[in-house]
UniProtKB/Swiss-Prot annotation:
One Pfam family it belongs to: RNA_pol_Rpb2_6
Record's protein name: DNA-directed RNA polymerase subunit beta
Xref: PANTHER family: DNA-DIRECTED RNA POLYMERASE I SUBUNIT 2
SUPFAM superfamilies recorded: beta and beta-prime subunits of DNA dependent RNA-polymerase (SSF64484)
Lineage of source species: Bacteria, Pseudomonadati, Pseudomonadota, Gammaproteobacteria, Enterobacterales
Protein source organism: Salmonella typhimurium (strain LT2 / SGSC1412 / ATCC 700720)
UniProt GO cellular component terms: DNA-directed RNA polymerase complex
Length: 1342
């Protein structure tokens, strides 16, 4: 494998055995591709905005005299960039401008004569744009639109599994679900009649729909039944015989023909009898007259002489009727063929319960069901029915729905109309009846072929269409009002409904979520999440067990592990690593094609529907060098079952062992040794890890760390290769390679880094360069690390030396004992940034003012404020300190004579204002790192605001001029090269000022042209610089668009440093979580023979019952990795020659049975080997991919190479006594995470505070500054102890005895420590509740 210069800095040893056929795809493509489809112009108009416009336009007036046509649209440029939007709290969006054409036709002239055409570009609101990382900035916060897994449009056949009716009879039903429009359901009732429901309303007999489609009873029976023909010959009844229909029947008379008896009366007719009848070619048999009684006629029979109806279609025949028919000359009688086995009389029975008999009555019946209480008219009933399923405006199956519909009905074509046809409805009824008759299967709703993904683009398009439809109504009204000659398209369109619909979706839809930004993994997982909840989806309460369960079709599409615990389990899932959506929105996963028993590298993506037809081998099947399967029988999956198949039956093979799991689960090493429940917790807890001060790569990883770190977008990645020309903490400049430059550009890439900004979860986002001056970089190399990344690899926690042993009860029940060294070295110290805002409003009594002049506040409290009343940057503040001084005018108060006197003497003291300053919340302390002041347009800016503006301007000017200098330097170096190559002497050239170089004339015409081109570029550069500077200045100095009534907002950012402490929650990656019980002095920790103490002591009892053995293997492998690092460290310290170092590191990389990774250190220069060794000092990082990881033997070999015991256990000594522990202890390195459940955020105390309105009891919870709940169990405990007075105090003065608690407060103030309990308020509430039941309870004084 070829490594770039940057990748050579640290190479992770990979234990994976299977070759990597397919690289991990870009992990955010589900979001980015979907939104791209929404906003890019699609010439076919199938997707996105184009499709929405085409479906609504052209809009015609009611009279048809004019129409508004759509021509094209374009998206403008956003006003602010992403960072500016976040700071200002606005939405990152672009204006949508649509070109519309108003066409007015001549009234009197023949149709289509155009009178006037006006075209104009119309503004249609703002469309939020997606950032490069797949998020949206809405009102200044980053949000993610989660994809939804919903039931695909189409037709579904299902049964109630015998649960509806008490008899346990299985009732079948069919449901046609459109993409938009009314649902159509067909269902059987326990009596086997077929009913129809529209939009899940009251049910009607299903034949009503057929009558409404203009079918007569005869035609209906003709559609659904085969016929049996009887003929009356010579006063005998002959029946036309189709032998196959007799199978399984019992003969009720002798079946004979030509004097030969085929079946005797009472015998069962078997296949042998049928073969005999077919062989002899028997077409008719004679039947007794009674046999026809009870049969059902298939058409109307009329007496032709009188015109009288003898027998209507669907009537049962009797012997009387037969006689009548025979008399009136009907010698041939057609009846319906039915039997109990596979030709039920369902439709015939349904026609009997159908109250309607013609089209109109059917339409009226449907109208009454849809619009109860409204008087039906013929026109209303007809238009209602037409609009339900046959109007393109109201009904759309969509391409997906039509494809699924036709596939379900086994039709050949998959394309077709978006509305239903007569045939569609009849075919669905036929298939439902076939299923009831025992032919065909019902569908599995949880199959991923019946559930599809709706991503951002599609949901945004639907919302946009909703807005457009609202506009359409208004435009229609406007077009009909006449007076069109003076109107332009602009006057008809009101953009409000559109922007409101879009805004509502992005701002408050259930699927538009506040981004989980704890660390890069939680961002990526959030964007790859798939939810079954949301509009048009399921609800938590109604979702049953089946929907939540893992389905065989989830394989390679949806992760079976990563899902929340709790009420949402199984409803919220995560996309598997390689999964993607196809054009219809179904999830598909890649497989390697197998041709004639040879596995090729050809990749096919299969959806769940297609996968059912193939036999698919697992990724860990053994192959020889040619790609043949080694074993004769291979474990494969087929139709959702797993079994053994011979190798020539195999069609496909999995691409990778980690194909099954999601990104989160693929980061857990030795996942294959963990119990599924614990793996679920491990995957979920990695997302809660807080980025530590110094990121530390995991010693034991899975090889996915780099992909996650790069794709998450928190790192700075090189867009093009080149050399590092300049680097400091906030900027990296790359001089681009010649071959990657665009013609006519300076060839300089500038990367500005993010410094100490706040994330959504208040953690700290900070980027640090990881390249040095002069280093070569290639496209895709990581230039700067973000939060939780280390040299371009995801690093969520720290590698800790752990021992599994009990330690004096301090690790009872998952508690964790931590060494003080961890605190001293700041291993788990995290930085949290809080944003506190102070809003100055315009009140009825006058404006609030931000000032340092606050009444009744001492000098000390104001010491950290400047003259504008805003805290200085860099000030250390603690709970209760004033950050922004603010006063609010208060109403005129009646003054006492004394106050009047004082006022008269000392002049007007500011007593008509009250202090409403922004203070630091209790329990928070930190450093002010930034202050932002936003002032409304037209309000005078204070001194601080002007200072900040000046600073920003300076910074912007500095940034831009530095950029200009860098670009100029690049340009002039190219100009110099042209001049020198044309023969100008370099020394003379360097003496000339650079500006004069461009004035030189060259004899060589080609070179002169080049020089002129470069001169042009130089002018353009300067012009661009002026333009950018002016734009920046305008942005900085313009007023801010604040909410109504707000004059000023001051935002203060506090950085809080949190060290690890008892009560913080920590976890490994295997679901092994615990709370820190004690920080132990270093000297008391257990230590080994070399005197090295352990960092963390974990309880060994946490392993066996939880079955997450992966943590033990990780610990052993971590120990080996560290051992090798220690040996490298020793060699570096002894300054051994590079050859020895190279040989040892090469041995470590080569270790392991047939591993895929080939590292050849002989191609590395000595410097590169030394730098690699330097990065391996703290341990050699190892990758053990999921389901393809290091084997036990390999771990032992690695331990041996690091001169460590192969058991992984060592002798430890007690730090307090120095005695040896009685048995060897498992010690090694485990990757531990600090989770975002910090004791500082949970610790809370209250003396007095707010009370609930009704019960007058203290509120609950830290956010409400609530009290501790003393619940019923706690009451029982005090009762059990007989602590009567304590209990009385708890239930009265400490809770809701209003008078008692005020008295008690007064007593304490007076120094009199006595209490008189009174009546608890909740007792009064109880009395009122009993009275509300009509029972009057009076309290009497004794």
């Amino acid at each position: 494998m070829v490594y770039s210069y940057t990748e050579k800095k640290r190479i992770r040893k990979d234990f994976g055995k299977r070759p990597q056929v397919l690289d991990v795809p870009y992990l955010l493509s589900i979001q980015l591709d979907s939104f791209q489809k929404f906003i890019e112009q699609d010439p076919e108009g199938q997707y996105g905005l184009e499709a929405a416009f085409r479906s609504v336009f052209p809009i015609q007036s009611y009279s048809g005299n004019s129409e508004l046509q759509y021509v094209s649209y374009r998206l403008g440029e956003p006003v602010f960039d992403v960072q500016e939007c976040q700071i200002r709290g606005v939405t990152y969006s672009a204006p949508l401008r649509v070109k519309l054409r108003l066409v007015i036709y001549e009234r009197e002239a023949p149709e289509g004569t155009v009178k006037d055409i006006k075209e104009q570009e119309v503004y249609m609101g703002e469309i939020p744009l997606m950032t490069d990382n797949g998020t949206f900035v809405i009102n200044g916060t980053e949000r993610v639109i989660v994809s939804q897994l919903h039931r695909s449009p189409g037709v579904f056949f299902d049964s109630d599994k015998g649960k509806t009716h008490s008899s346990g009879k299985v009732l079948y039903n069919a449901r046609i679900i459109p993409y938009r429009g009314s649902w159509l359901d067909f269902e059987f009732d326990p009596k086997d009649n077929l009913f129809v429901r529209i939009d899940r309303r009251r049910k009607l007999p299903a034949t009503i729909i057929l009558r409404a489609l203009n079918y007569t009873t005869e035609q209906i029976l003709d559609l659904f039944f085969e016929k049996v023909v009887f003929e009356i010959r010579d006063n005998k009844l002959q029946m036309e015989l189709i032998p196959e229909r007799l199978r399984g029947e019992t003969a009720s008379f002798d079946i004979e023909a030509n004097g030969k008896v085929y079946v005797e009366k009472g015998r069962r007719i078997t296949a042998r009898h049928i073969r005999q009848l077919e062989k002899d070619d028997i077409k008719h048999i004679e039947v007794p007259v009674e046999y026809i009684a009870g049969k059902v006629v298939s058409k109307d029979y009329v007496d032709e002489s009188t015109g009288e109806l003898i027998c209507a279609a669907n009537m049962e025949l009797s012997l009387d009727l037969l006689a009548k028919l025979s008399q009136s000359g009907h010698k041939r009688i057609e009846t319906l063929f039915t039997n109990d086995l596979d030709h039920g009389p369902y439709i015939s029975e349904t026609v009997r319960v159908d109250p309607t008999n013609d089209r109109l009555s059917a339409l009226v019946e449907i109208y009454r069901m849809m619009r109860p209480g409204e008087p039906p008219t013929r026109e209303a009933a007809e238009s209602l029915f037409e609009n339900l399923f046959f109007s393109e405006d109201r009904y759309d199956l969509s391409a997906v729905g039509r494809m699924k519909f036709n596939r379900s009905l086994l039709r050949d074509e998959i394309e077709g109309s978006g509305i239903l046809s007569k045939d569609d409805i009849i075919d669905v009824m036929k298939k439902l009846i076939d299923i009831r008759n025992g032919k065909g299967e019902v569908d599995d709703i949880d199959h991923l072929g019946n559930r599809r993904i709706r991503s951002v683009g599609e949901m945004a398009e639907n919302q946009f269409r909703v807005g457009l439809v609202r506009v359409e109504r208004a435009v229609k009204e406007r077009l009909s009002l006449g007076d069109l000659d003076t109107l332009m398209p602009q006057d008809m369109i009101n953009a409000k409904p559109i922007s409101a619909a879009v805004k509502e979706f992005f701002g408050s839809s259930q699927l538009s979520q506040f981004m989980d930004q704890n660390n890069p993994l939680s961002e990526i997982t959030h964007k790859r999440r798939i939810s079954a909840l949301g509009p048009g989806g399921l609800t938590r309460e109604r979702a049953g067990f089946e929907v939540r369960d893992v389905h065989p079709t989830h394989y390679g599409r949806v992760c079976p592990i990563e899902t929340p615990e709790g009420p949402n389990i199984g409803l919220i899932n995560s996309l598997s690593v390689y999964a993607q959506t196809n054009e219809y929105g179904f999830l598909e996963t890649p497989y390697r094609r197998v041709v004639d028993g040879v596995v090729t590298d050809e990749i096919h993506y299969l959806s769940a529907i297609e996968e059912g037809n193939y036999v698919i081998a697992q990724a860990n099947s053994n192959l020889d060098d040619e790609g043949h399967f080694v074993e004769d029988l291979v474990t494969c999956r087929s139709k959702g079952e797993s079994s053994l198949f011979s190798r020539d039956q195999v069609d496909y093979m999995d691409v990778s062992t980690q194909q099954v799991v999601s990104v989160g689960a693929s980061l857990i090493p030795f996942l294959e040794h963990d119990d599924a429940n614990r793996a679920l917790m491990g995957a979920n807890m990695q997302r809660q890890a807080v980025p530590t001060l110094r990121a530390d790569k995991p010693l034991v990883g899975t090889g996915m760390e780099r992909a996650v770190a790069v794709d998450s977008g928190v790192t700075a990645v090189a867009k093009r290769g080149g050399t590092v020309q300049y680097v400091d903490a906030s900027r990296i400049v790359i001089k681009v390679n010649e071959d990657e430059m665009y013609p006519g550009e300076a060839g300089i890439d500038i990367y500005n880094l993010t410094k100490y900004t706040r994330s959504n979860q208040n953690t700290c986002i900070n980027q640090m360069p990881c390249v040095s001056l002069g280093e070569p970089v290639e496209r895709g190399d990581v230039l700067a690390d973000g939060p939780s990344t280390d040299l371009g690899e995801l690093a969520l926690g720290q590698n800790m030396r752990v021992a599994f042993m009990p330690w004096n009860g301090y690790n009872f029940e998952d508690s964790i004992l931590v060494s003080e060294r961890v605190v001293q070295e700041d291993r788990f110290t995290t930085i949290h940034i809080q944003e506190l805002a102070c809003v100055s409003r315009d009140t009825k009594l006058g404006p609030e003012e931000i000032t340092a002049d606050i009444p009744n506040v001492g000098e000390a409290a104001l010491s950290k404020l400047d003259e504008s009343g805003i805290v200085y940057i860099g000030a250390e503040v603690t709970g209760g300190d004033i950050l922004v001084g603010k006063v609010t005018p208060k109403g005129e108060t009646q003054l006492t004579p004394e106050e009047k006197l004082l006022r008269a003497i000392f002049g007007e003291k500011a007593s008509d204002v009250k202090d409403s300053s922004l203070r630091v919340p209790n329990g928070v302390s930190g450093t002010v790192i930034d202050v932002q002041v936003f002032t409304r347009d037209g309000v005078e800016k204070d001194k601080r605001a002007l200072e900040i503006e000046e600073m920003q301007l300076k910074q912007a000017k500095k940034d831009l001029s530095e950029e200009l200098q860098i670009l100029e330097a690049g340009l002039f170096s190219r100009i110099r090269a042209v001049l020198v190559s044309s023969g100008v002497e370099a020394e003379k050239l360097d003496k000339l000022p650079r500006d004069r170089w461009l004035e030189l004339g060259l004899t060589d015409e080609e070179k002169q042209n080049q020089l002129e081109q470069l001169a042009e570029q130089y002018d353009e550069l300067k012009h661009e610089f002026e333009k950018k500077l002016e734009a920046k200045r305008r942005k900085i100095t313009q007023g801010d668009d604040l909410a109504p009534g707000v004059l000023k907002i001051v935002k203060v950012y506090l950085a809080v440093k949190r060290r690890i402490q008892p009560g913080d929650k920590m976890a490994g990656r295997h679901g092994n979580k615990g709370v820190i019980s004690k920080i132990n002095p270093i000297e008391d920790m257990p230590y080994d023979e070399n005197g090295t103490p352990v960092d963390i002591v974990l309880n060994p009892l946490g392993v066996p019952s939880r079955m997450n053995i992966g943590q033990i293997l990780e610990t052993h492998l971590g120990m080996a990795a560290k051992g090798i690092g220690d040996k490298i460290n020793a060699m570096l310290k002894q300054q051994q020659e590079v050859a020895k170092l190279r040989e040892f590191i090469q041995r470590a990389y080569d270790l392991g049975a047939d591993v895929r990774q080939k590292v050849d250190l002989s191609t590395f220069s000595d410097d590169e080997v030394l730098r690699l060794a330097e990065n391996l000092r703290k341990g050699m990082p190892i990758a053990t991919p999921v389901f393809d990881g290091a084997k036990e033997a390999e771990i032992k070999e690695l331990l041996k190479l690091g001169d460590l015991p192969t058991s992984g256990q060592i002798t430890l000594f007690d730090g307090r006594t120095g005695e040896q522990f009685e048995r060897p202890v498992t010690v090694g390195y485990m990757y531990m995470l600090k989770l975002n459940h910090l004791v500082d955020d949970k610790m809370h105390a209250r003396s007095t505070g707010s009370y609930s309105l009704v019960t007058q009891q203290p509120l609950g919870g830290k956010a409400q500054f609530g009290g501790q709940r003393f619940g019923e169990m706690e009451v029982w405990a005090l009762e059990a102890y007989g602590a009567a007075y304590t209990l009385q105090e708890m239930l009265t003065v400490k809770s809701d005895d209003v008078n008692g608690r005020t008295k008690m407060y007064k007593n304490i103030v007076d120094g009199n420590h006595q209490m008189e309990p009174g009546m608890p308020e909740s007792f009064n509430v109880l009395l009122k509740e009993i009275r509300s039941l009509g029972i009057n309870i009076e309290l009497e004084d004794e």
